[in-house]
Amino acid sequence: MKNIIRHLSKPAYREEFKGDTSPRTAAYISNRADASLGSTYKLPLEAKFWKMSIALICFLIVSSNCFASEPLPWQVTFQPPASPIMEELHHFHNFLLYISTAIVLFVAGLLGFVCIRFNAKNNPVPAKFSHNVLIEIIWTVIPIIILVIIAVPSFRILRHAEKIPETDLTIKVVGYQWYWHYIYPDHDNLEFDSVMISDENLKPDQKRLLDVDNRIVIPENATVRFLITAGDVIHSFAVPSLGFKIDAVPGRINETWTRVAKKGVYYGQCSELCGINHGFMPIAIEVVSKEDFDNWIASKNKTAMNGKNPKLAAN
């Protein structure tokens, strides 16, 4: 009723309904008052909705950078780099993004300019020239310069990845359908299989489709060389946060290296289609302190000596 009285006090309502106090008129005025009030609050509600949407998008983008070890739903960026090679790849990606964005904006702006400036309405008589030497030189030289600018850091990263420094630890990796076999030749040829943990055996703190029964364990700040091959078909040994993806080819040994300064567990997966269970070949690399690594080696060797490390049967 207060809404009706307030709106009736406006000049427009006083003139329109002067002297009319019937219930029908009162209901009509009430509906118009409610509609007016609704339109009054429409903008703040929309603003609140957009603020919440922007906040949610920012949360998804930022949260994707808060976890270094695993892929996340709705992740739109790389996993944060955990090795020297991945740090270089991350910077190179951002560098390429700036160049690509500039090219896209330039081409889109040029296309819009041409559509507006040289349409049939503005140019009823079309130009009759067939070529322009200066323009052709420009659009040939500029792409060459861009490619050279891109190639220099690209080759530098490739050289850094291929040139393996003096190593502190070597690990042999053998891919099978559908599990990984690891060998530590520097530690009495310690070897074990690594198999994905099934859903029924998964513990609350373990990650589905990523955790394994036996992880690779390496010490922090140690240069580790991986010698990679396969025993049946082609696989691919890939850990995104460490910046490597190396094919495991039967009869051939490929190699890569890494050095991780931060403790934690870093996950990867087989990245080469290798059969029906290709998607169930995760890789888990745990980085620990030097003391914990030595204790882990001693424990594994003791287990092997006691005969409690059975080989995985072919499946």
Curated annotation (Swiss-Prot):
It holds the Pfam family COX2_TM. Its main location: membrane. It is a multi-pass membrane protein. Cu cation binds at H235, C270, C274, H278. Its EC number is 7.1.1.9. The keyword Zinc-finger does not apply. It is found in: Cell membrane. It catalyses: 4 Fe(II)-[cytochrome c] + O2 + 8 H(+)(in) = 4 Fe(III)-[cytochrome c] + 2 H2O + 4 H(+)(out). GO terms for cellular component: plasma membrane. The chain crosses the membrane at residues 41-61, 96-116, 133-153. Its cofactor is Cu cation; heme. Binds a copper A center. Subunits I and II form the functional core of the enzyme complex. Electrons originating in cytochrome c are transferred via heme a and Cu(A) to the binuclear center formed by heme a3 and Cu(B). NCBIfam families: CoxB (TIGR02866), RPE1 (TIGR01045). Belongs to the cytochrome c oxidase subunit 2 family. This is Probable cytochrome c oxidase subunit 2.
